[in-house]
Regions:
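Bacterial Sec-dependent N-terminal signal peptides
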Residues: 1-24
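Basic side chains
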Residues: 2-3, 67, 163, 187, ...
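Generic structural motif
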Residues: 4, 36-39, 137, 173
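N-terminal, active-site-proximal structural segment of metallo-dependent hydrolase catalytic domains
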Residues: 20-109, 113-115, 119-129
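Short loop/turn segments at secondary-structure transitions that flank enzyme active sites
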Residues: 37-40, 140, 185-188
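Active-site His/acidic residue clusters
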Residues: 44-50, 175, 181-197
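Short regulatory "switch" loops immediately downstream of catalytic or recognition motifs
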Residues: 74-81, 150-152, 188-189
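Structured beta-strand-rich core segments of catalytic domains in phosphoester-bond hydrolases
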Residues: 96-185
């Protein structure tokens, strides 16, 4: 996963450098992606199959708080090897349950210190997991956010809904930037859904 993040960061750096070449100006921005691995709160969301992450199944407030603390530290550390004071300009997130977990996440000290904000649109996934976009508003300004549904070409089950693609348009370093945050269907979904994604 680190290799993918580094490759994406390198691509963004090269892209921004190419735009700036005419002016001989180069800016370095770290960006990333992090799978939150089922960041669920401890409350049931109506209409969602989130029962595995409720107190009856052993998921409790202490585990949730520890996960928030650990995730916030990991996210805040991303990009600090090159940009120790600012870290990532933005980070795509997957497997977040709802606005509440994102509110709780950005209230954690390491992210709150950077005034991190987020974009999230509730999707149709049966389990309730979505993608989100975490960003530093002093480095990236959001212009437009949209959820594009994931459509299977030959889906056998028309009732099968999964997370879509969160698209974010914004501005960074005076340039228009478009980001797509996605989390492809997992092995649990079977080969048809993975391969058609």
């Amino acid at each position: 996963m680190k290799k993918n993040v580094l490759m994406f960061a390198a691509f963004l750096i090269v892209s921004l450098a190419a735009f700036a070449q005419g002016q001989k100006r180069f800016n370095l921005y770290a960006v990333g992606f992090y799978n939150q691995e089922n960041l669920f709160d401890t409350c049931h969301d109506e209409g969602k199959n989130d029962y595995e992450y409720l107190p009856a199944k052993g998921w409790n407030g202490m585990k949730y708080t520890n996960k928030l603390r650990n995730m916030a530290k990991a996210l805040a550390d991303m990009g600090t090897d090159k940009l120790p004071k600012v870290g990532c300009a933005f980070i795509g997130l997957s497997e977040v349950e709802n606005h509440k977990v994102l509110d709780d996440l950005i209230e954690q000290a390491p992210l709150k210190a950077r005034n991190m904000k987020y974009c999230h649109i509730e999707g149709p996934d049966r389990r309730g997991i979505d993608c989100a976009f975490l960003y530093n508003p002093s480095l990236f300004s959001v212009k437009n956010v949209k959820l594009v549904p994931y459509v299977q070409e030959k889906a056998k089950d028309s009732a099968y809904y999964t997370r879509g693609f969160l698209t974010v348009r914004g501005e960074m370093a005076g340039e228009d930037v478009a980001v797509i945050v996605c989390h492809w269907p997992s092995r649990f979904s079977g080969p048809f859904y993975r391969e058609s994604g």
